[in-house]
Design a protein with these regions (language model features):
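Extracellular/periplasmic helix-loop-helix junctions in multi-pass membrane proteins
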Residues: 408-425
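Short, Lys/Arg-enriched, Gly/Pro-containing loop segments at transmembrane-helix junctions
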Residues: 296-302, 343, 380-383, 446-457
Length: 459
């Protein structure tokens, strides 16, 4: 940056900028240059930033800054040493990012020595890294896209980079299939945000930067970004869980209604009962699963690819392996209910009780399945830290309370009748097997993995 100013002692051009650029403009002998470079290296090796200043006296007719700088022969004024220390929590956060599969790349306008020392202090640059892991902006700009794509996976630092280098680097990373997040608080970072999957700035950034960014963090900390990643991955898993639960319940309901129409004379569910079932599957259970708190285990997983769909083979397999047995149980019970209700002399009250039991068994199956789905995709028990999940607790309580109220007081509107407390207990603990069997299977698999971490060993 250069500016012309009139002072009491005359007319001057003042220059500030990168020490290398200022050195080229100054009139220095070899000894002065050696001392200058030695001073810069001393502070850069400590991770400090440097900014040099120079000036030149002008004649009254000299007004073109570009011509003045081209002529050179400026007088060196001095160098500002700026200490921008790394926060104490940064190395630990960088280590957690590495475990989470997040690769941190530093693209900076600083000198290579300064950038490397800052990266080393932060934990980005390791002892095993070498010159293949860093490049200057000038070298990067000279490369073709094919050449750059070949070396980008190894690059950790781009020093003396321009905003254009940062933009191109983000574009090429995305070409490699990476999910790219760019951080920056400067106006020069605005164009880069549009070429990344998400642009991140801090709360103290300029208004224009905030408007362009996809995410704004109030605390200017890398840990905040890591926490956002944990929340994002948790929300993604929770979305998959609620889809597994909803589709399992809906497939079970569809198959039961369809096959019952073919095999039985009894209508499995009334319209009012279907409304309550829909409220459970599409609202209460969804809220319960989506409000599950974030787990630190999410930071031990690798990032998912762009090509991965929400509905995977695991999702489909879980839906089928759960809904088909549920359907079989319900159809067997419906046939038993129909057989009992067609016995000669059976009272209408008993018929309603049998149908109320069938209705309640369906709801209890979904109740226990909701608890199982909470543990789906994890290695934990379904009851692990269960009482910290307030949304899940509230949802399961509402299901039990709502079902009890509808059966006991629904009457003809819901085709239900009062059931004895012993009957409620029988249904509750009989359907408990829906939870116990998968939980026991997970426990056995967990025990097997602990004994054989590398799988089954055969001779």
């Amino acid at each position: 940056m250069a500016t012309i100013a009139d002072t009491e002692s005359g007319r001057y051009v003042f220059v500030k900028g990168a020490p290398e650029a200022v050195e080229m403009l100054c009139d220095m002998n070899e000894e002065q240059k050696a001392d200058y470079d030695k001073l810069l290296d001393y502070y850069r090796n400590k991770g400090m930033r440097t900014l040099s200043f120079a000036r030149k006296r002008l004649e009254a007719c000299e007004n073109n800054t570009a011509e003045v700088l081209a002529a050179g022969k400026l007088k060196y004024i001095g160098t500002a040493i700026i200490s921008d220390s790394i926060r104490p929590d940064i190395p630990e956060t960088v280590m957690q990012c590495r475990k989470a599969g997040i690769k941190i790349k530093i693209v900076t306008g600083e000198n290579g020595t300064t950038a490397r020392e800052m990266a080393r202090t932060a934990g980005v640059w390791q002892d095993t890294d070498c010159h293949e892991n860093e490049i200057t902006g000038e070298e990067f700009a000279k490369m073709s896209d094919e050449e750059a794509l070949h070396i980008i996976p190894k690059i950790k630092i781009i020093s003396r980079a321009t905003p254009g280098d940062k933009q191109r680097f983000a574009q090429l990373q995305r070409k490699l299939g990476e999910v790219v997040a760019v951080t920056g608080n400067n106006v020069n970072d605005i164009p880069v945000f549009s070429f990344a999957d998400v642009g991140i700035c801090s709360g103290n950034a300029e208004t224009a930067v905030k408007e362009s960014a996809g995410a704004i963090i109030e605390e200017d900390s890398l840990f905040t970004i890591l926490a956002a990643v944990r929340w994002g991955r948790t929300m993604y898993e929770n979305m998959r869980r609620q889809m597994v639960f909803r589709y399992t319940a809906n497939v079970t309901l569809f198959l039961t209604m369809l096959l019952a129409a073919i095999m039985c004379d009894t209508i499995p569910f009334t319209a009012s009962q279907l409304l309550w079932i829909g409220l459970i599957t599409d609202f209460i259970a969804v809220i319960a699963l989506l409000t599950l708190p974030p787990s630190n285990r999410q930071l031990n997983k690798k990032p998912r690819k762009h090509t991965v769909y929400i509905i995977t083979k695991d999702v489909i397999r879980n839906i089928l392996l759960t809904s088909l047995p549920f359907t079989a149980i319900l159809l067997v019970m419906l046939n038993i209910v129909e057989w009992l209700n067609h016995k000669p002399g059976i009272l209408p009250v008993l018929q309603l009780k049998n149908l109320s039991m069938f209705f309640s068994v369906f709801v209890f199956l979904q109740f226990w399945n909701l608890l199982c789905v909470r543990a789906w995709g994890s290695k934990n028990f379904a009851l692990h830290k269960f009482f910290k999940c307030r949304g899940m607790l509230a949802g399961m309580f509402l299901i039990l309370l709502g079902q009890a109220v509808l059966v006991e007081f629904g009457g003809s509107a819901f085709r239900t009748f009062h059931l004895n407390f012993s009957v409620w207990l029988e249904m509750f603990f009989t359907t408990f097997l829906v939870y116990a069997v998968p939980e026991g299977t997970r426990a056995a698999m967990r025990r097997f993995r602990n004994k054989h971490p590398k799988g089954l060993i055969t001779k």
